[in-house]
Every structure is written in structure tokens, then in C-alpha cells.
A protein has these predicted regions:
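N-terminal accessory segment detector
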Residues: 2-271, 276-283, 287-300, 308-317
Length: 317
């Protein structure tokens, strides 16, 4: 089943995955007490209640969350491989896209999702839970390898060319990927901005079990998302809390830049957050979109979504 079909068709009554006119698809819209809970965990809870249709819908949406993020990473790789300074580029952009297209279409979790649906039809709780877990593990392996690959390619560009060349690759990727993803951001309510932000980090499989758990704290003027660890650069640096795979000390900035939080040692994968969420909006005369604090460190990463975007301070969360 295509991921587009999953989020464009109506879901069963009681499912928290609801239609969004702004996004043109369904997205989880449950309350603050559960929005940061892994979609896998939510599906398991409905399985335990015998709510098979809702659990099956959540399993489909869980695969959609992970696929959406992996597809974003594939798009980023297309841009990197087509970049003239990458050292692996080929003439034109079509060839990198052809290379990535084969990988993008593989669908490592598709068979497991079919098995989950069959188990739900048979009301087999153990089988459904087991196949959701297997689906996550398969998707996580692809996700983590893509993050690792991007980190190493960007590190090579920085070493062979310049740190500014990495910034330029991220800007090109913004035009191909993130600009469209966040096109509706100005029209969204604060809660809608939170929903799409949390969805992305559930899809990155953040949290202490690498299954998509995100802390959410509502403050007077903003929402705080707590990623401990972030499922991408956090797992890269700190290791996989699920499998026990050790982290690494990722190569990163040797010079403090205004597009890297004026920090030295920000990993090359992680630096896109500073560029896309803070530096680029300010270059265009807008406030930071989603300021971060503690990104790519040994501790939690905090994201801030201000209820009044114009109140987001420049250069600080």
C-alpha cells in the first residue's frame, strides 16, 4: 500500500490520525498528554484494548511517519550526490536520483505491515505487536545508515572543499525538501506547528527506546519539545539506546559560524537544524522558525515552538 493512500483515506472512528486541510493529509492530532508518545506504543495500547481497527490504522501511520523521514533523507542524499564538490557526483542530477530511486522504492517495512493487518483481522495481539516491532527495527536500520552516510559525505565535502560548502549543500536541500514541508507553517496554529514538528521526530525514532518518544512541555509563551536523544544526530553521537550500537564523535565545525550556533564541533549532519530553523529565516528577515538548545551534545536536545512566532528571539531559544 502506498504511503499516500494511508494518509489520504479516512481512518476508523476513534483514530487520532485526523485530516488536516493545511497539509492535505491525515496527521496525529491527539492531546498534549499523548502526542509525544510513540505511535508504536499507541498502537500497542489499542491492541491491548481489542480496538483492532484503530491499532491497524496507527500501525499504517507509524510506517508512514518513518517512511516520510527516510524519504527526506533520500532527497538530501540526491542533493549531496549531485553537488559538484561532493567527490562522488556525476554529470547532471538525473543519475543521482536514479541511484537513490532504487533504494527509496525498496520498502523494508511493507511486508510487516501486511502481517500486522492480517494479525489484527485474526485478533492476534502477540503476532500484531511482534510484527510492528519488527517493522520498526527494519526501518530504523535503514534510517540510521542514511544518517551515517549523510554525516560522512558532508564531512568529506568540508574536508575537501570548505565548511561553507556544507552550508551551501544544506541551502540547496532546503529548496528541494524543507521549503515545501514547511510551506504552510505561517498559516498554522501553534498546536498545528507542534503536531507536524512532533510527527517528524517520532518518525526519526527519537527517545530512550529509539521508537519515537518525544517529551512535550507547554510553557506560557511556547511549547518545548525534549528529544533524549534525538533519533538522528543524537543517536549518531550518543549511540543507539535500543540495539546498544555505540555512538561516535562525528566530525563537525572547526570554526564558529553564525549558521552553526557560533559553536565549534557541531556535527555535519546536525548543522542543518541551525541553518534551516534559525539562520535562513533570519537571513530572509523573519524570526527563527523553531529555535533549538543543546542540539548535538551529550544531553537532551530542546526545540522551542513559540505561540507568537514573532516573539522568538534571534540567536537564542
Amino acid at each position: 500500500m502506498s504511503r499516500t493512500e494511508v494518509t489520504s483515506r479516512p481512518g476508523p472512528a476513534g483514530s487520532p490520525v485526523l485530516w488536516s486541510d493545511l497539509l492535505g493529509r491525515r496527521i496525529r492530532q491527539d492531546g498534549m498528554d499523548t502526542l509525544g508518545v510513540s505511535t508504536q506504543t499507541l498502537a500497542e495500547q489499542h491492541l491491548a484494548k481489542g480496538e483492532w481497527e484503530i491499532a491497524g490504522d496507527l500501525a499504517e501511520y507509524f510506517l508512514d511517519e518513518m517512511t516520510r523521514i527516510n524519504n527526506a533523507l533520500f532527497t538530501w542524499l540526491e542533493v549531496i550526490l549531485a553537488f559538484p564538490g561532493s567527490g562522488v557526483s556525476v554529470d547532471g542530477v538525473a543519475e543521482p536520483r536514479q541511484v537513490i530511486a532504487a533504494m527509496r522504492s525498496f520498502g523494508p517495512g511493507d511486508g510487516d505491515l501486511v502481517a500486522v493487518a492480517l494479525a489484527c483481522d485474526a485478533q492476534d495481539l502477540d503476532a500484531a505487536s511482534a510484527r510492528i516491532e519488527t517493522m520498526r527495527v527494519r526501518m530504523a536500520a535503514v534510517h540510521d545508515q542514511l544518517v551515517w552516510w549523510i554525516q560522512h559525505l558532508l564531512a568529506d565535502i568540508a574536508e575537501r572543499h570548505s565548511e561553507e560548502a556544507v552550508r551551501d549543500v544544506v541551502i540547496r536541500t532546503y529548496e528541494e525538501l524543507w521549503r515545501d514541508r514547511y510551506a504552510a507553517w505561517p498559516q498554522m496554529t501553534p498546536v498545528e506547528r507542534l503536531q507536524i514538528s512532533v510527527e517528524g521526530m517520532r518518525g526519526h525514532l527519537s527517545g530512550p527506546r529509539h521508537r519515537g518518544d518525544v517529551g512535550i512541555i507547554e510553557e506560557d509563551d511556547r511549547f518545548r519539545m525534549v528529544l533524549d536523544p534525538c533519533g538522528s544526530c543524537g543517536v549518531l553521537r550518543r549511540g543507539d539506546p535500543d540495539s546498544g550500537r555505540p555512538g561516535c564523535d562525528p566530525a563537525g565545525t572547526r570554526t564558529a559560524h553564525d549558521w552553526s550556533w557560533n559553536r565549534v564541533g557541531v556535527g555535519w549532519y546536525a548543522v542543518h537544524s541551525a541553518i534551516v530553523m534559525e539562520w535562513l529565516p533570519q537571513q530572509e528577515g523573519r524570526p527563527p522558525m523553531r529555535p533549538l538548545d543543546g542540539c548535538d551534545t551529550s544531553g537532551p536536545c530542546n526545540w522551542f515552538i513559540h505561540k507568537d512566532p514573532s516573539a522568538a528571539p534571534a540567536g537564542a531559544p
